């Protein structure tokens, strides 16, 4: 298994990439995914890393980098390869290769367990929206 910076724009805009990344999107649609990726491609502070296993991409992580800190915009692993440590390896390897001092993320109840397993500390916050409140977590992992 290898984790690499993905610069293949055709793949990033593909339905294969969307099928992996959709699990970390709110109400995912392929059109919305493509629009987000196109925005990221125009932002030099955003990088996309993928996990490749025997030539097949099984996970991806989108990061916004600022000096020695990164914020996870999204991280996802293909359905059939979940719970095998791919997400954790994405975080660890990117932290090493990009020489990061810390990685931040914001998540919900569904994913907080993943971040805990990866060693992130967390702060529980409640966000108020017109249609109700939502519990979110600000997570941080230090080198």
Language-model regions: role of each:
Residues 39-45:
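Short loop/turn motifs at secondary-structure junctions and domain boundaries
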Residues 104-106, 121-139:
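Conserved catalytic-core motifs of GNAT/GCN5-like acyltransferases
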Residues 96-110:
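Conserved GNAT acetyl-CoA-binding A-motif
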Residues 77, 83-96:
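Conserved acetyl-CoA-binding loop-helix of GNAT-fold acetyltransferases
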Residues 50, 56-64, 69-76:
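Conserved beta-strand in the GNAT
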Residues 1-35, 50-52:
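Short amphipathic alpha-helix that is part of the acyltransferase structural core
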Residues 115, 120:
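Conserved active-site tyrosine of GNAT-family acetyltransferases
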């Amino acid at each position: 298994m290898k984790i690499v910076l993905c610069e293949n724009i055709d793949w990033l805009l593909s339905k294969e990439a969307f099928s992996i990344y959709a699990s970390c999107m709110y109400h995912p649609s392929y059109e919305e995914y493509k629009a987000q990726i196109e925005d990221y491609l125009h932002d030099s502070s955003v990088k996309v890393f993928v996990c490749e296993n025997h030539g097949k991409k099984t996970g991806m992580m989108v990061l916004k980098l600022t000096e020695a800190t990164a914020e996870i915009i999204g991280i996802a692993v293909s359905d059939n390869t979940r719970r095998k440590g791919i997400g954790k390896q994405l975080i660890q390897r990117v932290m090493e290769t990009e020489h990061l001092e810390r990685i931040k993320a914001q998540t919900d109840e569904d994913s907080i367990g993943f971040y805990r397993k990866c060693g992130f500390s967390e702060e529980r916050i409640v966000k108020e929206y017109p249609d109700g409140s939502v519990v979110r977590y600000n997570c941080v992992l230090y080198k």
